[in-house]
Regions:
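Helix-loop-beta element that forms the nucleotide-linked donor phosphate-binding surface
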Residues: 158-187, 200
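Conserved donor-binding loops in enzymes that form glycosidic bonds
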Residues: 18-20, 177, 211-216
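Conserved donor-binding/catalytic core segment of Leloir-type glycosyltransferases
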Residues: 151, 203-216
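An amphipathic, basic-hydrophobic alpha-helix
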Residues: 68-94, 131-140, 210
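A short helix/loop element that forms part of the nucleotide-sugar donor recognition site in Leloir-type
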Residues: 185-202, 208
Length: 216
């Protein structure tokens, strides 16, 4: 089902992603979009393999236990087990935050795997099961014969997807910047900057380098 801007009545949505944890960029975008949909009166069922973190009572989560040990086999298992759940419910839209078959809408948080693989690896890499799995997932979303509508967060992504999969341009929808207001510099940012420099004895002509690593 394609995107139709005039459809403003309450919808029943399925949100699908492989894993949720509160510190991932994709996952944070997922949660912001989910809360906005709830605010507008839509209902959402979430399907995932794993959920780490608190749950919203208005956001029911179905955990699907995949088979297999490797990531690509587990994802294949998740997609296969997901289909009966989607068939049992009259969903208006199936929205994916990872590349997988059967999506009406895909939120493109990841870059083009095909472009990255060909730039970083030789031809031998394309023989691996992992490569074949990830390309098949991309084709299921971006192939010219598919109907999935694509929400982009970067215009630069579109060229690669169109190059490798001949995706029609009209299926791409560029989203505005989604920076949270609490991440924007406040009106007293200059005062805070001066106070921080005084606290750590940093002169006006000196730079402070802050190195951050995440290992959640």
């Amino acid at each position: 089902m394609g995107l139709n801007p005039v459809q403003v009545s309450q919808m029943k949505l399925a949100f699908c992603l492989f894993n949720y944890f509160p510190f991932g960029g994709l996952q944070r975008d997922f949660m912001r979009i989910a809360h906005e949909c709830l605010r507008r009166g839509h209902s959402i069922d979430v399907y995932t393999m794993k959920w780490d973190g608190p749950r919203d009572p208005l956001l029911p989560v179905t955990l699907i236990q995949p088979n297999g040990w490797q990531n690509h086999t587990r994802r294949d298992s998740f997609v296969s087990q997901l289909q009966p759940y989607l068939a049992q419910q009259p969903y208006d839209l199936v929205v994916g935050f990872n590349k997988m078959p059967g999506l009406d809408v895909y939120y493109a948080a990841d870059t083009c795997f095909q472009a990255k693989a060909r730039a970083q690896h030789g031809a031998w890499y394309r023989l691996l099961p992992r490569y074949r799995h990830l390309v098949a997932c991309e084709k299921a979303v971006f192939a010219a014969s598919m109907k999935t509508e694509i929400l982009l967060i970067s215009k630069n992504q579109q060229h690669d997807f169109m190059h490798y999969y001949q995706t029609p341009a009209q299926r791409f929808h560029l989203l505005p910047p989604g920076i949270s207001k609490d991440r924007i510099a406040p009106v007293d940012a200059d005062i805070m900057r001066v106070a921080l420099r005084q606290k750590f004895q940093i002169e006006k002509n000196e730079f402070l380098l802050l190195l951050i690593g995440s290992g959640f």
